């Protein structure tokens, strides 16, 4: 790869490392450019699984330079009770939830939260009940 911008999709986010699936089918281990962390993002994680990104090769390293605008995302309040949010995933085409009726019993409120979260921006959603 050269210094030109390459496009890919984040398939794994672990700490400061991101696995990016390229348009050619290769997987590159990337880091994000430092200035991306400081762009006024009110999220605990600036890059999430599902994000389409533009990245460059710098020697043997790959660096995410920018995010392509997200079509949708699932978000929650950050666990540290700050005013920040935590984006769980982005650019979601469909969401499925498999729940059990017993052993262990799935709380109906959990299904409600799933459906409400998906209602805003995910067009295809399904719930499967396993008896």
Located regions from the model:
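G-domain G4 guanine-recognition motif of GTPases
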Residues: 98-102, 126-131
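Histidine-anchored nucleotide/phosphate-binding helix
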Residues: 109-119
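N-terminal accessory targeting/assembly segments
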Residues: 1-108
């Amino acid at each position: 790869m050269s210094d030109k911008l390459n496009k890919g999709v984040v398939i794994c986010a672990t700490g400061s490392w991101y696995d990016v699936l390229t348009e050619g089918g290769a997987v590159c281990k990337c880091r994000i450019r430092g200035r991306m962390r400081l762009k006024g993002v009110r999220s605990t994680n600036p890059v999430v699984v599902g994000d389409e990104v533009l990245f460059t090769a710098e020697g043997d390293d790959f660096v995410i330079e920018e995010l392509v605008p997200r079509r949708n995302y699932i978000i929650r309040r950050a666990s540290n009770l700050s005013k920040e949010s935590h984006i769980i995933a982005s650019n979601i085409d469909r969401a499925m939830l498999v729940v059990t009726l017993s052993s262990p019993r799935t709380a109906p409120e959990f299904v409600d939260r799933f459906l409400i979260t998906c209602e805003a921006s995910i067009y295809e959603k399904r719930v499967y009940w396993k008896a």
